[in-house]
């Protein structure tokens, strides 16, 4: 399970955090009493009030002045309810971020026209990564803070409140100091993480600091204590301006105007990636949204766009090769694992190595935190099960089929001419086996004729109750005439069912189909092989394709048009583009011996599996001239098998000589024997014998049409299809998205093991821990409730986006009321409650997400790069929208929208100063002695983390002092 491991420094910091509000609360009680005695009138400004105001949704808990015990009870209820609401917001934000991931993963197809006129298609993402991070991604991670500010203003008659703005500033401080401090510390010792897109980081950091400086300017400089309409609107419009500036920096549009850009397809899912290059020498066109754009003429995207098609193909091939390499390594590392487990491991490894968005890490952190399990491992396991199930499709008749199916066991049968009879098996599957089923059969001529080649047969087969298999026999007529192989057909027809329910025992034809019918195959083909010829020897086909993963390839050599006598057929392999000697296949040669009446033999060749994604190599398998085994050779072979005789290759008196070996290790004088032929070769032949010899010559074995088989070794179909499926399924939007409500409800009620993300492999399935069960049961209400949110599959994620943000708004309204009532119950001001408790609660999922991103990602962008952008968006959207609405409302009524500059202006100024220190330290850490913003030597990590935690504690400390008038603000 993912845990937030904190150093002693962090532990001390959080203990101080809990102590500070209580300290000031106690001090304020004393000062409040003193001021009341001295008729002070500033207690409302400088102390927390114990009198609560009606919330946007929640009413006031009466009576307003409870006893000390009741205050503790009320504070506990408010605090627990607030924490539970934070859990709910985290879970619905998980759905919200899933929809954002799906939306920003949308692609469009473009057509590339090559110089030779050929066209090819590829896909590009619609959303720019930087734009999506600053808009939808930032909105997703900061939605509670933004909505809290808007709801607070709108819910309190468009008057300014402390909770929303203070939450935004407090959340920004927590993100800037605590989250970055944690990310610096959790990177393993000696490792570093750098920000990849430094230009974008500079722009967003500058805008983040400017955003809070701008708040100070409009509150304390331009129009102190009043927010005018143009100030609110300009604050809001800074948001799209910030996005444009970040996009310009990302695209290098201002600084690299005249640097020609070259575009190639990325390794992940055919995405187009930009890199700088020389002016193109050839003309390339690209079609987007149905229009062909000539990059040489139109200077597409402020640079000459060159879509290097060859390089794109190479990168696609490289991605597949990488996937194939991973599968091969896993197979070698885990030879005992099944294909499902190997696919799961490969899928998880590829997804783990893939660059991930901020949304993904936020979703992953929330699900691990709430007992929903590791989404990467769950997705990998699901895909593996689906992939294996695709290979295990069973086409047989289901046993629970209500209709009985009657069919032949196989569609083709073979027999020799001298076999006497051929047996055909009829099967019965499914339906009610207590019924009696009748089925008619009859033979039909093919190339074989009834009466001369086989016996015409017809009849009825009866399946009694419980019987599932029957056998019928057809007589085969033998003759001594050389003839081609012939065939005839056997048909099934007229299925009838008998049951006790029917009056006459036989059901009517129009009722039979509901109980029994013919299955497939209902016709069998019987081939009769002639046995009067020694045979024609051939391969089944001239070319065969085999998978390199086949291992031992077996090739059939057929003996047609006769099967009389013993025949030896030599064979050998011949190299083509495939090499023998164990490189692509093992060289094979030998002889096949067909016994009398034997019609099929197999040749085995070992194919070497080197698991290439694409392979197309050939070799040949050739059979030589067949020869009849003469009587002497036949006897020698028999003696060799039984008694250890070998052929010497010598002749005595015209007869072959055989040597019997008594012992191989200690030879003794051998015995030489001769076997005389039954006939004398020198004796003249009679006319009858001459005719017999002529007939015998006609019946000698010969080669058929296909004597040289071309074997094409291809990549393993299973291996290739597995790689292709993994390539298609490595889209993170598919991992975090959902397709149906059923899937969402199953996921909501299922508790999964939250395994450590440090694991490189899935390993064996683990059971959920006690912590997983506790968190699951604490959050199961929210999980089931938010399972009603539309799946991300609908409207390309927009349906889920809209419903989720409405849900977040409702929960945020409850959180605002609970936080305000909690603060007033214990005497804390809203500004302090917001900075400490609400900001912490809304930032916990981001803390987990950044921790995971810091340890898993190659760069620091996903962990801290979005912090600065998110802070700027919080101000421009959260405060800009809320204050614009309120300023317009008051201006329409002829009033001014007044905002007290004191606490907020002080907090903003303090945060801005500390933020400069934070960014300066991060940039200094890029020096070679440390190597990056995150990680580095242990001493440097500790010093940096301690400094950032100290900055945050100082921010909380001074903000609280100012809020309670212990120091003077602005």
Curated annotation (Swiss-Prot):
Residues 393-493, 524-624 form the Calx-beta domain. InterPro entries: CaCA, CalX-like_sf, Calx_beta, DnaJ_domain, Na_Ca_Ex, Na_Ca_Ex_C-exten, NaCa_exhngr1, NaCa_Exmemb. Ca(2+) 4 binds at residues 453, 479, 483, 486. Alpha- repeats lie at residues 138-178, 839-875. Its main location: membrane. Residues 93-133, 189-201, 250-797, 843-871, 925-941 are cytoplasmic. Ca(2+) 5 binds at residues 548, 610, 612, 715. This is Sodium/calcium exchanger 1. It comes from Felis catus (Cat).
């Amino acid at each position: 399970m993912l845990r937030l491991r904190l150093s002693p420094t962090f532990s001390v910091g959080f203990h101080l955090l809990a102590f500070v509000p209580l300290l000031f609360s106690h001090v304020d009680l004393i000062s409040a009493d003193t001021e009341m005695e001295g008729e002070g009138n500033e207690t409302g400004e400088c102390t927390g009030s114990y009198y609560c105001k009606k919330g946007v949704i929640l009413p006031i808990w009466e009576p307003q002045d409870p006893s000390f015990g009741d205050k503790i009870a009320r504070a506990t209820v408010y605090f627990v309810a607030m924490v539970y609401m934070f859990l709910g917001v985290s879970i619905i934000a998980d759905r919200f971020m899933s929809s954002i991931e799906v939306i920003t993963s949308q692609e469009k197809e473009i057509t590339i026209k090559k110089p030779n006129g050929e066209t090819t298609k590829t896909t590009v993402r619609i959303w720019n990564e930087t734009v999506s991070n600053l808009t939808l991604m930032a909105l997703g991670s900061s939605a509670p803070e933004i909505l809290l500010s808007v709801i607070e203003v709108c819910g309190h008659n468009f008057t300014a409140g402390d909770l929303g703005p203070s939450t935004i500033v407090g959340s920004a401080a927590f993100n800037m100091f605590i989250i970055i401090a944690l990310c610096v510390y959790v990177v393993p010792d000696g490792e570093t993480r750098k920000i990849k897109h430094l230009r974008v980081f500079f722009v967003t950091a500058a805008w983040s600091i400017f955003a809070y400086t701008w708040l100070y300017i409009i509150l304390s400089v331009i129009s102190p204590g009043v927010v005018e309409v143009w100030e609110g609107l300009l604050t809001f419009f800074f948001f799209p301006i910030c996005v444009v500036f970040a996009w310009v920096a990302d695209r290098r549009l201002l600084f690299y105007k005249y640097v020609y850009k070259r575009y190639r397809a990325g390794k992940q899912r055919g995405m187009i990636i930009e890199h700088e290059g020389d002016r193109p020498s050839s003309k390339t066109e690209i079609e987007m949204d149905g229009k062909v754009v000539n990059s040489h003429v139109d200077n597409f995207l402020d640079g000459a766009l060159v879509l290097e098609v060859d390089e794109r193909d190479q990168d696609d091939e490289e991605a597949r090769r990488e996937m194939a390499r991973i599968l091969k390594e896993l197979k070698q590392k885990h030879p005992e694992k099944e294909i499902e487990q190997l696919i799961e491991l490969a899928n998880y490894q590829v997804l783990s190595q893939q660059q991930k968005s901020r949304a993904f890490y936020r979703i992953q952190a929330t699900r691990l935190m709430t007992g929903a399990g590791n989404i990467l491992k769950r997705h990998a396991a699901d895909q593996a099960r689906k992939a294996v199930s695709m290979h295990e499709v069973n086409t047989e008749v289901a046993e629970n089929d209500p209709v009985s199916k009657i069919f032949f066991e196989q569609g083709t049968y073979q027999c020799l001419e001298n076999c006497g009879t051929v047996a055909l098996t009829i099967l019965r599957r499914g339906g009610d086996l207590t019924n009696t089923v009748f089925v008619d059969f009859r033979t039909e001529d093919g190339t074989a004729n009834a009466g001369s080649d086989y016996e015409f047969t017809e009849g009825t087969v009866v399946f009694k109750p419980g019987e599932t298999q029957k056998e019928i026999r057809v007589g085969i007529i033998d003759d001594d005439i050389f003839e081609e192989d012939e065939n005839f057909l056997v048909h099934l027809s007229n299925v009838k069912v008998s049951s006790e329910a029917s009056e006459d025992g036989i059901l009517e034809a129009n009722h039979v189909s509901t109980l029994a019918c013919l299955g497939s195959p209902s016709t069998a083909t019987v081939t009769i092989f002639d046995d009067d010829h020694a045979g024609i020897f051939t391969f089944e086909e001239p070319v065969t394709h085999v998978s390199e993963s086949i291992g031992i390839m077996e090739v059939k050599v057929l003996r047609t048009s006769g099967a009389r006598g013993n025949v030896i057929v030599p064979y050998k392999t011949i190299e083509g583009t495939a090499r023998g000697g164990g490189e692509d296949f093992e060289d094979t040669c030998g002889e096949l011996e067909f016994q009398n009446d034997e019609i099929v033999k197999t040749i085995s060749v070992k194919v070497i599996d080197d698991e290439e994604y694409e392979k197309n190599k050939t070799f040949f398998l050739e059979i030589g001239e067949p020869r009849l085994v003469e009587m002497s050779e036949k006897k020698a072979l028999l003696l060799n098998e039984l008694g250890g005789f070998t052929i010497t290759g010598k002749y005595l008196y015209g007869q072959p000589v055989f040597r019997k070996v008594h012992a191989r290790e200690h030879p003794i004088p051998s015995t030489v024997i001769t076997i005389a032929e039954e006939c004398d070769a020198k004796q003249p032949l009679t006319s009858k014998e001459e005719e017999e010899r002529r007939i015998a010559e006609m019946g000698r074995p010969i080669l058929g049409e296909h004597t040289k088989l071309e074997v094409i070794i291809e990549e393993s179909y299973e291996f290739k299809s597995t790689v292709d499926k993994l390539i298609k399924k490595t889209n993170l939007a598919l991992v975090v998205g959902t397709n149906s409500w059923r899937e969402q409800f199953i996921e909501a009620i299922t508790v999964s093991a939250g395994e450590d993300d440090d694991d490189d492999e899935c390993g064996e399935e683990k059971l959920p821990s006690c912590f997983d069960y506790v968190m699951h049961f604490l959050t199961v209400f929210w999980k089931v409730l938010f399972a009603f949110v539309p799946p991300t599959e609908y409207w390309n994620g927009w349906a889920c986006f809209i419903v989720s943000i409405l849900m977040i708004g409702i929960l945020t309204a409850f959180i605002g009321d609970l936080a305000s009532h909690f603060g007033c119950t214990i005497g804390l001001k809203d500004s302090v409650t917001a900075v400490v408790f609400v900001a912490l609660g809304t930032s916990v999922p981001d803390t987990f997400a950044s921790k995971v991103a810091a340890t898993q990602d190659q760069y620091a962008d996903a962990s801290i790069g979005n912090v600065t952008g998110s802070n700027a968006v919080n101000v421009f959207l959260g405060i800009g929208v809320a204050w614009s609405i309120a300023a317009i409302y008051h201006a329409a009524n002829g009033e001014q929208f007044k905002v007290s500059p004191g606490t907020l202006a002080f907090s903003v100024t303090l945060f801005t100063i500390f933020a400069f220190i934070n960014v300066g330290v991060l940039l200094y850490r890029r020096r070679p002695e440390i190597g990056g913003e995150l990680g580095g030597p242990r001493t440097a990590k500790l010093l940096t983390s301690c400094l950032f935690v100290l900055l945050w504690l100082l921010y909380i400390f001074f903000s609280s002092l100012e809020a309670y008038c212990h120091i003077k603000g602005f």
